[in-house]
Amino acid sequence: MAIKHFLQFSDLTLDEFEYVIERTRIIKRKFKNYEPHHPLVDRTLVMVFEKNSTRTRLSFEAGMHQLGGAAIHLATRDSQLGRGEPVEDAAQVMSRMCDIIMIRTFGQDIIERFAANSRVPVINGLTNEHHPCQVLADVFTFIEHRGSIKGKTVAWIGDANNMLYSWLQAAQVFDFHVNVSTPKGYEIDPTLVAADNTHYKLYAAPSDACAGAHLVTTDVWTSMGFEEENAARLKAFDGWIVDAAKMKRAQPDALFMHCLPAHRGEEVAAEVIDGPQSVVWDEAENRLHAQKALLEYLVLGKLS
């Protein structure tokens, strides 16, 4: 199989995603039943972190171990990357010593340059522009709870950040719709959305974006790297909290998701994230299973 990277959601086809989602279901079932599943024995994952992480590191490191392989954690500050080694050189070296690489960094250009010089698959663990692994887990979580996501409506309330851009790509792949509501000054960057993407609609009022939605989702108002804007963002995002009133505008059985960590009382009310419509803990756990399926696919291809 030719090298396949997962740098943004659109890097895989619908057929590939359907395979990975089915493998996620099987792998999760095996995990719950304590059935050994070790397809990646003697394989090594290198995890490169320029941004801090809890869920990404845990899910990839535990996942690779559960698949029978090994995971190496490498913080850029502890490597030559932190001392100015060119990304291209680091990619050439690392990819000769492992089987797959996951990178969590700032600019998408960094991971694109790395992948262009890598001899093994590269996975985007998060960049400022995209968070495809999280949305893969989110789509699986929706399917797990509600069945097919095709034709459904997802409401995105809050910042036009990496999560939103991955959701918009997912909407094109899986053929669903995204209602987007962001405050003035924090709107979608058109350069990060495909020109032919007709699977979303913009709303000025967040409550209107929630109307009829099958899933309501949000993220923190201040992402990593934008901490100096926090005070201005708190003011600008006033009114964009996902609360019970907004959830009532959605479908009666609508789900709520958040990629975490969450700030109760800011982007989401405690009554929502801790309420019966919230599936955030399943969503977080499914990072583990979805990424195991992704690792398996990118290293081994489709299993017969």
Swiss-Prot record:
Catalytic activity: carbamoyl phosphate + L-ornithine = L-citrulline + phosphate + H(+)
Ligand binding (L-ornithine): 162, 219, 223-224
Record bears the keyword Transferase: yes
Gene3D superfamilies recorded: Aspartate/ornithine carbamoyltransferase
Pfam families linked: OTCace, OTCace_N
EC number: 2.1.3.3
InterPro entries recorded: Asp/Orn_carbamoyltranf_P-bd, Asp/Orn_carbamoylTrfase, Asp/Orn_carbamoylTrfase_sf, Asp_carbamoyltransf_Asp/Orn-bd, Orn/put_carbamltrans, OTCase_ArgI
Entry keyword set: Amino-acid biosynthesis, Arginine biosynthesis, Cytoplasm, Transferase
GO cellular component terms listed in the entry, alphabetical order: cytoplasm
One of the GO biological process terms: citrulline biosynthetic process
Enzyme category, top tier: transferase
Family named by the database record: Belongs to the aspartate/ornithine carbamoyltransferase superfamily. OTCase family.
The protein's name: Ornithine carbamoyltransferase
Species for this entry: Herminiimonas arsenicoxydans
Lineage, highest ranks first: Bacteria, Pseudomonadati, Pseudomonadota, Betaproteobacteria, Burkholderiales
